[in-house]
């Protein structure tokens, strides 16, 4: 009867809990079918195909192999749904000018001669102070650099901007070092002047889903095989004694934590009791407490 309740709507499903990844990815699944949507029979190739607006929002790889191919998708790693129901993806803002402030100007490369300092000079603290004094309250043109500010963009806004990928060359202060960079202009790949870049990808795994990001050396795989790999990872039965993989991509820890199937301790301590139902961890009490230590009990998920 529980199963019946969950299948009362076409878009409601009983949660897939084969392993932590299956649960996480099931919660991030997207469908073009259901009430007000398409039907398998009516959907042609056009609808199922990967579109440039999917970048950073819907994974181009993880989709079922059967009749649902391209109709059921998965959220990309950093994508989010905004208050209006649109998918957004984050980008780092690129700046080409800064306010005449010594702190802001330090380590920036001048785009034009200012205060007797030649264009192309990387400013040190003294030079930055000199320029700041000369240009007080004005904007100083610098070579493009990637800030740590993030903007979430939907596909419509992104289409009007010029986006560079996360693999572009930057120096240790995030200045762009190449005069020409590979970028997406209106969704199409081009090589363009660095000065024209508006945003840079947050990460190289921005356009793919969590399951796909778990595949090591994904860039060497054929797309069809990567699709099979992403889908089959969700079907793997968990080990009784789990081990860390010898080769990983670095996202394993985050995926496991966010799946909701892992019991996390509030703080480190000594395990003083453990069985199939619970774990008790003893940690130092905070300063000023009456007790010397605190025992915290964590119930385990047991079936």
Predicted regions and their residues:
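Intrinsically disordered, low-complexity regulatory segments
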Residues: 1-303
């Amino acid at each position: 009867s529980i199963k019946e309740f969950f299948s009362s709507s076409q878009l409601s499903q009983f949660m897939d809990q084969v392993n932590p990844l299956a649960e996480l990815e099931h919660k991030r699944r997207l469908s073009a079918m259901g009430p007000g949507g398409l039907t398998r029979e009516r959907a042609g190739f056009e609808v199922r195909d990967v579109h440039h607006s999917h970048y950073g929002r819907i994974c181009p790889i993880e989709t079922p192999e059967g009749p649902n191919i391209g109709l059921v998708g998965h959220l990309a790693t950093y994508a989010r749904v905004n208050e209006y129901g649109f998918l957004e993806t984050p980008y780092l803002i690129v700046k080409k000018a800064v306010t005449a402030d010594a702190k802001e100007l330090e380590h920036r490369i001048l785009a034009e001669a200012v205060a007797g300092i030649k264009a192309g000079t990387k400013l040190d603290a003294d030079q930055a102070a000199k320029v700041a004094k000369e240009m007080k309250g004005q904007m100083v043109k610098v070579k493009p650099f990637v800030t740590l500010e993030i903007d979430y963009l939907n596909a419509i806004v992104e289409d009007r901007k010029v986006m560079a990928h996360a693999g572009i060359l930057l120096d240790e202060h995030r200045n762009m070092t190449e005069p020409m960079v590979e970028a997406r202009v209106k969704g199409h790949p081009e090589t363009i002047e660095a000065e024209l870049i508006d945003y840079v990808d947050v990460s190289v795994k921005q356009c793919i889903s969590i399951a796909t990001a778990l595949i090591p050396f994904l860039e060497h795989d054929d797309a069809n095989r990567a699709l099979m790999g992403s889908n089959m990872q969700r079907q793997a039965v968990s080990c009784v004694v789990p081990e860390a993989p010898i080769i990983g991509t670095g996202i394993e820890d985050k995926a496991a934590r966010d799946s909701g199937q892992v019991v996390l301790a509030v703080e480190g301590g000594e395990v003083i009791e453990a069985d199939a139902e619970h774990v008790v961890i003893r940690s130092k009490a905070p300063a000023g407490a009456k007790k010397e230590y605190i025992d915290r009990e964590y119930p385990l998920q047991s079936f």
